Amino acid sequence: MRIVTVMNQKGGVGKSTLVMNLAAVMALHARVLVVDLDPGQRTLTDWAETAADRGIDLPFDFTDENNPAVLSQLRAANNWDVIFVDTPGNLEKSASERIGLVLDQTDFVLLPMEPQPASVKPLRRSISTLVEPRGLPFRVVISRVRRDEATASRRDEMYSSLAKAAIPFLATPVREYIAHSDAQGTGDVVTTYPQTRQTSLAIDDFKSLALELNSIWANERH
């Protein structure tokens, strides 16, 4: 069983989209739980409630919690293969303390970031103040990548910068699609999107991310 925390100091980096859709794809082959530990925003809770209201059966279990200590109880229950945890999108003192308690129960960290220079400083701060002191394995995910030449260039520059700084990252980016923007309002995840060429590409992104992560985790066990 593995607890995966998704975090970044900077809000608006696609954290919620990453959690819900990666969980949906992982749930195709594993028992998955999503935990909303961001009581200030409740983005994932609102998303899950919308899904329930519209009769959409999310492919994973879901719970919203206020106390990070619940993670140890969820681990002990051993009812899931992977638990994804959403956290506050800032590092103000109260949020930082909460994230610290979450990370104390965490096995792996994902840090989504946009392909723009303003994303680098908060990413480094998140890693240096919270992740590295605990010796946690982690990967950066480039998210919210628009499908135009300029953004592709910035994405490649960001990968180069991460490599030079020896910051580990996943090779698969999360590209922007209208379906992702609409999903919170409709309660959908990639596995329940209406089937179009674009939504097929969207689910491919998350399947590729899942393959990368499963490969990393398999190697960790050896």
Show which residues each predicted segment covers:
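Walker A/P-loop phosphate-binding motif and the immediately C-terminal alpha-helix
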Residues: 2-37
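P-loop NTPase switch/communication element
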Residues: 40-58
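Switch II (G3) loop of P-loop NTPases
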Residues: 77-99
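Inter-motif core of Ras-like GTPase G domains
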Residues: 95-116
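G-domain G4 guanine-recognition motif of GTPases
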Residues: 114, 138-153, 172-183
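Conserved C-terminal guanine-recognition region of P-loop GTPase G domains, centered on the G4
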Residues: 121-135
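Beta-strand-loop-alpha "switch" segments that mediate conformational coupling across diverse proteins
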Residues: 158-191
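Inter-lobe coupling/hinge region of RecA-like P-loop helicase motors
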Residues: 182-207
